[in-house]
Amino acid sequence: MGGSDSDSRSRSRNREENKSRSLSSSSARRPSPNHEKKHEHSSEKKKMKRRRSSSSSSSSSSPSPSREKKAKKKKKRREAKKLKREKKKEKKEKKRQKKLALKAERAAALTASVPAPVPEEKPQTYLKTWQSEETKEHGPAMTDEQKAKLSTRRPLTKEEYEARQSVIRRVLDPETGRTRLIRGDGEILEEIVSKERHKDINKQSTRGDGDAFQKRLGISR
């Protein structure tokens, strides 16, 4: 009887130990309520963050109506400024064109009112008239044959030219009193004379030049 009681006691102890072990293991496996609360709180935070990020991304992707209004206002202001600048430019251009037109009209009126200056014909001085007359050639009078040949403009033959050039004439200028040797149609030759004859010729020529000049000026000795 004593052995059976001891066996039953040992068995009951073993059972109790097994139960306590199983309870401790189950309690160890089960998370504590504080830990569960923390886990739930962190999961809620994560969810909130996700929602915020999604809302911020959606707000950034789709512009808000206030921003759109501001952008429209800025656009309108820019357009208004551009229009003002263009109007100012147009006004300036119109003013410039008006000024140019007025200047042109004034210039035209001045030119029309002021007559063009008529150049006055100055009477020629005696010196000029004398010089112009001096330039004229007072050569010998041409014969009818020479005039006819000049009018026909026929080229001379060699014989005709030599025959004409062989003729030497002494021609007197009635105004100056000078005598010249002329060969052919008008080639003036220099006459070789003595010193005394040369002096006489110079005296006569100076006298004749003085008389001719006084006649042109209208002065008489």
From Swiss-Prot:
<feature type="compositionally biased region" description="Basic and acidic residues">
    <location>
        <begin position="196"/>
        <end position="214"/>
    </location>
</feature>
<feature type="compositionally biased region" description="Low complexity">
    <location>
        <begin position="54"/>
        <end position="65"/>
    </location>
</feature>
<dbReference type="GO" id="GO:0016607">
    <property type="term" value="C:nuclear speck"/>
</dbReference>
<protein>
    <recommendedName>
        <fullName>ADP-ribosylation factor-like protein 6-interacting protein 4</fullName>
    </recommendedName>
</protein>
<feature type="compositionally biased region" description="Basic and acidic residues">
    <location>
        <begin position="131"/>
        <end position="148"/>
    </location>
</feature>
<dbReference type="InterPro" id="IPR019532">
    <property type="entry name" value="Nucl_RNA-splicing_assoc_SR-25"/>
</dbReference>
<keyword id="KW-0507">mRNA processing</keyword>
<keyword id="KW-0539">Nucleus</keyword>
<feature type="compositionally biased region" description="Basic residues">
    <location>
        <begin position="69"/>
        <end position="101"/>
    </location>
</feature>
<dbReference type="Pfam" id="PF10500">
    <property type="entry name" value="SR-25"/>
</dbReference>
<comment type="function">
    <text>May be involved in modulating alternative pre-mRNA splicing.</text>
</comment>
<feature type="compositionally biased region" description="Basic and acidic residues">
    <location>
        <begin position="33"/>
        <end position="45"/>
    </location>
</feature>
<dbReference type="GO" id="GO:0005730">
    <property type="term" value="C:nucleolus"/>
</dbReference>
<feature type="region of interest" description="Disordered">
    <location>
        <begin position="1"/>
        <end position="162"/>
    </location>
</feature>
<comment type="similarity">
    <text>Belongs to the ARL6IP4 family.</text>
</comment>
<feature type="compositionally biased region" description="Basic and acidic residues">
    <location>
        <begin position="1"/>
        <end position="20"/>
    </location>
</feature>
<keyword id="KW-0508">mRNA splicing</keyword>
<feature type="compositionally biased region" description="Low complexity">
    <location>
        <begin position="21"/>
        <end position="31"/>
    </location>
</feature>
<feature type="region of interest" description="Disordered">
    <location>
        <begin position="196"/>
        <end position="221"/>
    </location>
</feature>
<dbReference type="GO" id="GO:0006397">
    <property type="term" value="P:mRNA processing"/>
</dbReference>
<dbReference type="GO" id="GO:0008380">
    <property type="term" value="P:RNA splicing"/>
</dbReference>
